[in-house]
Amino acid sequence: YFHQLGYSPLEIASLFLFYEFFGVITNLIGGWLGAKLGLNRTMNIGLALQIIALSMLAVPTDMLTVIWVMLAQAISGIAKDLNKMSAKSAIKTLVPSGEQGALYKWIAILTGSKNALKGAGFFLGGFLLSWLGFSGAVIAMAGVLLAVFILSLCYLKGDLGKAKQKVKFSQIFSKSPSVNILSAARMFLFGARDVWFVIALPIYLGQVFGWDHLWVGGFLALWIIGYGIVQTLAPKVTGKAQGKTPDGRAAMGWAGLLATVTALIALLVTFNLSPQITIALGLMIFGAIFAVNSSLHSYLIVSYAKEDGVSLDVGFYYMANAMGRLMGTLLSGWVYQTQGFVACLWVSVAFSVLTT
């Protein structure tokens, strides 16, 4: 839509900078807050901020300036990252120590259901918009979140995830080599996805293939739903059913497979071999392999994180995740604008290789 309004790919990417930048800061600080105050508080702060962000969008249309919407988007991004970090850290405290198979299963379910619901949200948002109008839709969503917020205040344990020892602010940076290596891999993994998925792909589908907004939005929404479903199945795919719990070597192998598939897509598009079919099918295969990578990484960070103050390591890791999204989004706009879609795919290949 913004591309049709005359925005360049790089200008479109810049619209997301506020959101992604605050994701980096939120995860870094949020992990420390979770360990210091407890994950129940960071979860509730996130819910409250999301209600505020939605309420900001319920103002009259003439007040919905670009700055106002970007501010609401930034608050919403902070809220989302606080809730995600809190939920994934909490699983470490709820699953009995040593039960790595159960930990992997619950991390995969949480990660996959989150993304499947995100995809379903595209369709639900469209339904609410047509039924209640824009203001009515955001008010309805804020109302549902308010009910969840009240339940969270009543039922979440007060000491959930709170570190037993004093937590210094300097501890926001991980001292664990395993966490640092995994965080760097996560940064390049999500950079590999977003460098062609966020800006380049939607514009390419509309500009080159002539797809309208409904087709592009519906296709990507269904992709996200399928991506989430595959994430929930990742433990079965990676061998948990045979009693094996994957490790860092497994993550390297899946990242290598992702790089191979992306390189194959790039080659086929470079030589103009049925590009529309190649991208549609290639994106499905890429999404399935990426989903396993993402779910596997999400399990490994919670497994590697120390028991006391788990959110410190998880927050640092998801800071790297947000940094990868920020890097990928910026490059998606700039590389597509200057070099084209195929170049975005080759940058994705390079990032996938670095993930290994």
Question: Over which residues does each language-model region extend?
Answer:
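Cytoplasmic helix-loop-helix junction between adjacent transmembrane helices
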Residues: 72-114
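Short amphipathic helix-loop junctions that connect adjacent transmembrane helices
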Residues: 1-10, 199-216
